[in-house]
Amino acid sequence: MTENRVVLALLILCIVGFEPSFIHGATDSSDTSALNIMFSSMNSPGQLSQWTASGGDPCGQNWKGITCSGSRVTQIKLPSLGLSGSLGFMLDKLTSVTEFDMSNNNLGGDLPYQLPPNLERLNLANNQFTGSAQYSISMMAPLKYLNLAHNQLKQLAIDFTKLTSLSILDLSSNAFIGSLPNTCSSLTSAKSIYLQNNQFSGTIDILATLPLENLNIANNRFTGWIPDSLKGINLQKDGNLLNSGPAPPPPPGTPPISKSSPTPKSGNRGNRSNGDSSNSKDSSKSGLGAGGVAGIVISLIVVTAVIAFFLIKRKRSKRSSSTDIEKTDNNINQPIILASNDFHQENKSVQNPPLVETKKLDTSLSMNLRPPPSERHKSFDDDDSTMRKPIVAKKAAVVVPSNVNTYTVSDLQVATNSFSVDNLLGEGTFGRVYRAQFEDGKVLAVKKIDSSALPTDTADDFTEIVSKIAHLDHENVTKLDGYCSEHGQHLVVYEFHRNGSLHDFLHLAEEESKPLIWNPRVKIALGTARALEYLHEVCSPSIVHKNIKSANILLDSELNPHLSDSGLASFLPTANELLNQNDEGYSAPETSMSGQYSLKSDVYSFGVVMLELLTGRKPFDSTRSRSEQSLVRWATPQLHDIDALGKMVDPALKGLYPVKSLSRFADVIALCVQPEPEFRPPMSEVVQALVVLVQRANMSKRTVGVGSGSSGVNDYM
């Protein structure tokens, strides 16, 4: 009995002794889930042997790089481990994490929108992150240290208003563009800021009031003068267009700033008068002699006369112009028609009221001479608001059609697994496209508009673009499903086509897969031509696509073509510049020289796509011999030579095509790729030529191979 009691007592002691440790090691379920997803998003790296993709106990099992307090994760430190992939989409659940260090790895993609919200230290330096510095950083009020250096970030979407505790900010060696945000003035604890090796522009005046000790702005595009307050700190400024001399004098009429006394405010006139009175005993101290007084009196008389002259002139001009304003009032208000949902008519309603604008400019010039009396100010505002009314109404009229869905960044991150590489469908001129699968099973394609394509951070501008694209309605134009405009990010959501792009079919398909036979190629050419005909000749005003290429022709399950990016390049402000930088062999000669696009340049690009369908070759292929690298230069001389034409046909067709159909197809190509734009046909004529070709092909009963007799393989007709 005694022995049994001893054993029982020992068991109880063991249980009591181990229970606190067990409870201490149980990790909060939200923290565990966030780390599970983070592990999967980083491609389940072997370097993190204790980590798992589901379940586990990060605190109790001492996962590598994880520090806990109780059941909550408080620190994540995984620097210099060669980690790749992305960071997942549930980091915002880590509400107790105060330090997050993933520096010196190979992590890429966009920074996750959801980051731990209560961080004091965030270090993501020396990775491969792209896109923008996420807005969620703006909410981290406790943040003291932020390092995003040596990545490929382009847009600074951070609002610094709440980051009053931030002491060290390092954004160096990225691709940031534009001016520093005005909210930088809120960085009242900033000691060191590193902005070197970016493309920032504008002035650095916004940093003048900060308590900085170190500032590195080298190798940017800053202009203007260096504030005096920054000249006494550790400042590195080489590689800019800054003026290190004294700042220019203030504009005329601006009171000089005295170092000995602050600039008097509007309520200090009495004190100022007293000061002058007290100093009147010694005119040498006051600095105001009899000549100065006389000058001021004369100046006041002149200014009064000028004001009176303009008041009289303005009254007369108002009487004489009242009739004109009434006559033009209908034209001014006419842009309100833009509220109509008819995309094909919206731009026709825009009017230019030059007479009214001129009068508005004249009166505004007279206003700048002096503060007007209150009753006159009210009268002028009434007139001015009448003239401004059309502009305000026009902007307010931009409404996205009700059939277009609105998504949040969080929605799209979940659907794309935080825009993972596994869901990347392709990367084009204006951004990357991802496959998105939603909870209801629906699959869509999400295009993230690159900040360089839409540099303005104005949601209204993007909404206007979306509204215009949403009105495009044609069976061969990819349909817009929805959009997202949130925290400086702009995304468009399109219908998804499982067969991918024509480019993939022609150039990336595996040899054992079924090749694209002749009739589907003609069908794809005809459908794409009809899409362009719609944009060019049905839409009003006409829409120049600007980006016709095989990668933008998507194929559904029946190989029907759908032209993507329709209207996008036409409405984006920087499209021409971006397209010229990314020419892939589709650009017309005049576009390559001038950088300008037209309906006829679209026709040329379509001809290049037809050449791809005919030959199976890329528009430009550097792996081929120099004489064959440019598809147009190599193929054009052979289009009217039957023997040569047969030899340049895509070998994947294995000679199974109608010779007459092939010849007529080549004739259409030759017309489209004419060097002179005036000789290229309109798309309606191209459509008619291809319709006739398809009709004749369907009537044909045999297929002829190159250098062989007839064949009875009717499937290729």
UniProtKB/Swiss-Prot annotation:
It is a single-pass membrane protein. Residues 313-717 are cytoplasmic. Cannot functionally replace STRUBBELIG. Glycans are attached at residue 271. Its main location: membrane. The lineage of its organism: Eukaryota, Viridiplantae, Streptophyta, Embryophyta, Tracheophyta. LRR repeats lie at residues 96-117, 118-139, 142-164, 165-187, 189-210, 211-232. Belongs to the protein kinase superfamily. Ser/Thr protein kinase family. Expressed in seedlings, roots, stems, leaves, flowers and siliques. It comes from the Eukaryota. Pfam families: LRR_1, LRR_8, LRRNT_2, PK_Tyr_Ser-Thr. Residues 256-287 have a biased composition (Low complexity). Residues 26-291 are extracellular. SUPFAM superfamilies: L domain-like (SSF52058), Protein kinase-like (PK-like) (SSF56112). Residues 237-287, 365-385 are annotated as: Disordered. GO terms for cellular component: plasma membrane. It comes from Arabidopsis thaliana (Mouse-ear cress). The keyword Membrane applies. The modification Phosphoserine is found at residue 379. The chain crosses the membrane at residues 292-312. InterPro entries: Kinase-like_dom_sf, Leu-rich_rpt, LRR_dom_sf, LRR_N_plant-typ, PRK1-6/SRF4-like, Prot_kinase_dom, Protein_kinase_ATP_BS, Ser-Thr/Tyr_kinase_cat_dom. This is Protein STRUBBELIG-RECEPTOR FAMILY 7.
